[in-house]
Amino acid sequence: MAGRNEPPNALRHDLRRGEIIWVLKQDYPHLVTFRHLQLALRDRNIPLSERDLVSYLSYLEEGSYVRCVRRFDESDSLERILAAALTARGILLLDNKLTDAGVRF
């Protein structure tokens, strides 16, 4: 159960996606490595596991708000996200010219 000052789960996920877009905006249009993004979010008091960050980036990528560079890791038989960059559509979302119910700022 969420504490008094914690937003409900759905809202928390929406806000985290918004924070990811905000962090990527700082380096637009350049790529930000996965680890750098993870550390930048941690500096903003949003520590995310690799699995959670992949989930958020995948959601944002499906909406064409971010572009992810991936590599297949043969040792784990998994595709890993190496870096991400904000797209022009992501800028429009950040500037409130587009709306997405799953992203809040």
Predicted regions and their residues:
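Short acidic/glycine-enriched loop/turn segments that link adjacent beta-strands
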Residues: S77-E79
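Short amphipathic alpha-helical interaction segments
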Residues: P47-G63, I81
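Exposed, interaction-prone assembly regions rather than primary DNA-binding/catalytic cores
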Residues: A2-R4, V23-Q26, L39-A40, I46-R51, ...
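Short acidic, hydrophobic short linear motifs in intrinsically disordered regions
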Residues: H30-L41
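Short, amphipathic alpha-helical interaction segments positioned at domain boundaries
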Residues: I81-F105
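A short, conserved structural fragment
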Residues: E61-E74
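Short alpha-helical segments that sit at the start of domains
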Residues: M1-L31
